Amino acid sequence: MQTDSLSPSPNPVSPVPLNNPTSAPRYGTVIPNRIFVGGIDFKTNESDLRKFFSQYGSVKEVKIVNDRAGVSKGYGFVTFETQEDAQKILQEAEKLNYKDKKLNIGPAIRKQQVGIPRSSIMPAAGTMYLTTSTGYPYTYHNGVAYFHTPEVTSVPPPWPSRSVCSSPVMVAQPIYQQPAYHYQATAQYLPGQWQWSVPQPPASSAPFLYLQPSEVIYQPVEIAQDGGCVPPPLSLMETSVPEPYSDHGVQATYHQVYAPSAISMPAPVMQPEPIKTVWSIHY
């Protein structure tokens, strides 16, 4: 009886006769009386395959592999009553066409789990990488089809992000430095109206901000239980303003109210007071 050479993996191994199931390949076991059938159309059912292969021998079982959704993966297995019927199909595999479509027929091999690095396996000559009609890839080498289960890699969840709060800083000096703008408000009197002019320097500069000696209150930052930062309420501090002077005109007095923040220094809020007319009598 003519024997075929089997190769259960891309690595070359010694030929194994099909009529001797005890001489199994190195990395798999030949299932007796069973053949592998690939290239099956997804419309083909098990009854159609049984009817087709029954003309070549006594068919015991037909199994088409489906996915979880019940859709055919494009390959299956046919088990015959005797090994001779299975051997006959393998010898005529190149001549078998089902509905004008060539079938990939080979021995059924149960693969064994071996610890071989995938990178060390080099594909041999004559190896074909095929895809079923439903998109499942497999390797066809020396009449044997190999289906590789895709490796599932678990992605670790990202570390939860936490906000880092800085410790409260107590400043007792009346002069402090902070990346902020230097605001200077001046009042100019024009006939018939008031005009406020607030010049601003370029944003790249970070000059000192000089305040009059006054009480500066800082509140520490509270840390929430979830690791976030709870900003404290803004504390307002009022600077002293020079005494109003008398002139042959009208001068408006105002207070500059500052709202310090942990990020930037906002613009001063101008609160003009009611206009006071100062009369001076010269003798």
From Swiss-Prot:
Residues 1-25 are annotated as: Disordered. One of its GO terms (molecular function) is mRNA 3'-UTR binding. It comes from the Eukaryota. It is found in: Cytoplasm. GO terms for biological process: 3'-UTR-mediated mRNA stabilization; cell differentiation; positive regulation of translational initiation; spermatogenesis. Residues 160-184 form the DAZ domain. InterPro entries: DAZ_dom, Nucleotide-bd_a/b_plait_sf, RBD_domain_sf, RRM_dom. PROSITE patterns: DAZ, RRM. Residues 33-110 form the RRM domain. Keywords: Cytoplasm, Developmental protein, Differentiation, RNA-binding, Spermatogenesis, Translation regulation. One of its GO terms (cellular component) is cytoplasm. Interacts with DAZ1 and DAZL. Belongs to the RRM DAZ family. Probable RNA-binding protein, which may be required during spermatogenesis. May act by binding to the 3'-UTR of mRNAs and regulating their translation. This is Protein boule-like. It comes from Macaca fascicularis (Crab-eating macaque).
